[in-house]
Amino acid sequence: MKILAIQNRMGIGDMVIFLPFIEAISKKFNSPVSILVKENSKALEYLEKNKYIEKILILERGNNNSHHDGIIGSFNLAKDLKKYSFEKVFIFNSSLRFHLICKIAGIKEIFQYPLFQKKQQHLIKTAQNFIKKELDMDIDSNPIIELENSLIENAKNKYNINSDQINILLGIGGSGPTKRISAYKFLNFMKMATKEDDCKFFLATGTNEEEQIILNEILNSEFKERCVPLDKIKIKETLPIIKNCTVAICNDSSFSHLSAALDIPTIVLLSDTPLMYGSYSPNMYPIIPDGEETVTHDTLGKERINPEKIFKIFKEIVT
């Protein structure tokens, strides 16, 4: 059976969050599912070997002349999808556009969120209700990314990862300046951690200028000999490194989602993002700004993330 799932939200985090629901479709019909996703989901880097996913199709949208943009782009997308002869499609949004595209593509069975109800949709609960309604399945929010043991062992050898040390992923990047906790906060935690334990730190970030400033501040600190930067390698190559870690401490970034999905206890520093993004997985331990009962967009609390709270949860995890 040829089945398509459309997940058009941006970013790695959203793609990871939707994994359990896509896998549920595959299990229900005993058939791998193809997915249509945006390029910035980076799905090809961490889902290529997922047994529940057959093909990863890229939605080419984003600027005015992209292949799938506008009215002409809609017909281009319908034409592209028609080549695969999909029998069913599950659309994880309320867009009439995607509904019509799938009709034009000749897909007979179309399952979709209620049309025109995008406002105030809860990211996870809406997906859970959708799968319950269409497939009568109750799905927990616990994404899992599996890796081959050989990849994990190769990374352990290549990066001299010692199991006698506490190996810590520090996800110091973030999708915006209000989500990036200062280097000072991470250094404060590192000082507390190394006073009590032999630690090694893997610094995960992108190449954005501000992220590089934070990275270099840590690399130029007293802990530089304990640090391994990961900014120059692909996400695909970071996964087995992360899997070798004892714990992850991350801003709200792609790495908080990836590490939790790799079954690594992940402390998520939420300064300006809805709490749900750092608490949906049982592997996540959210920390919010001092003085707040919750956190959302425009909380602007990165200066009130407390390193002592990070250290307290860290010790609870590693002891």
Language-model regions: role of each:
Residues 1-319:
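Catalytic machinery of carbohydrate-active enzymes
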